[in-house]
Amino acid sequence: LLGIGLVAATLAAWTQARAQEVNLMNGVTPRPGDERTTAPNQFKKDGPWKIGMSHFGVNANTWTVQMAHDAEAAAKLDKRVGQFILLDANISQAKQVADIEDLVAQKVDAIIVTPLTPTSADAGIEKAVAAGIPVIVHTGLTETDKYTVDIQGGGVHFGKVMGDFLVKQLGGKGKIWVLRGLPAHPEDINRYKGLLEAIKGTDVKIIAEDAGKWQYDVGKQVCETLYLNNPQVDGIWSSGADMTRACVDVFQQYGAKIPPITGEGNNGFFARWIELGFPSISPEYGPEQGAAGVRAAVALLEGKQLHKRYIYEPEGWDLEKAKKYYRKDLSANAWFPTSLTEQDLQKYYGKH
């Protein structure tokens, strides 16, 4: 009888824990094979809360700007968040180190970190956790695993979705260009790993690669240089939509046929894709991850249990899905999926 009671109690506790599963963002799920969680009420605190965020570079590109907007909007939405301090490392490792130390010194209740490089935030994360401050990591990897919660999107999966698409488009054989993101950024390193995984064992060969830094202007310079050097290319793997848009514009400028090229959930890219209909795929990497980080911080401060590690690996979008999200009334700088309200979308991206 005792055994039955114990099983029932365990089952009840398990059901309760499952019922409390926090939805951080659509597509974000606990990492399979990692059962680690925070303890119930481990970080529970009465509000108002002071939440800090160390952003690797708000103005690195249009996506990073919106990810910051998504984070700020999510914090503003919860009245228990008395203060949301967003510090911008501006693509400087030294600044990110100082920013995290600053947030620890300010005794914030939780810290969200988007690391610039795989090691730029490690010491700060360990220091914060040692001080009893929960740390949430997203949009980039860390070498340390001392963080409280990790949300890993994009990365290898993102790069592989694009690589698999090109392999399929080219029938397993052909020459491709590679446009990479910000050098040394963990997201760029992992997306590239995903591409290499996808083309391994095929006859798809990389004939040229360069860093477009996830920016339209730099991407355009890179693409134009590659085109003028040798326009014979069968497909293009682009690590970000602003660079994809730039490449599409280069091919248009020279009156050339646009080869299969990979995209991303960006309004400006969607406009070109819908208008021109070239072969593409859009892996998902929403700026809503900024909001997911804030939601994780709030959940911990509410005393909820979270998994230590989450993944965000949705399927790539096809043209039909892009058409559903595309907004003619918003600028090219808007990204999806986002949790920004209609009011915020119009404020930041409305074509006034």
Describe the role of every protein-language-model region.
Residues L2-A13:
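Bacterial N-terminal signal peptides
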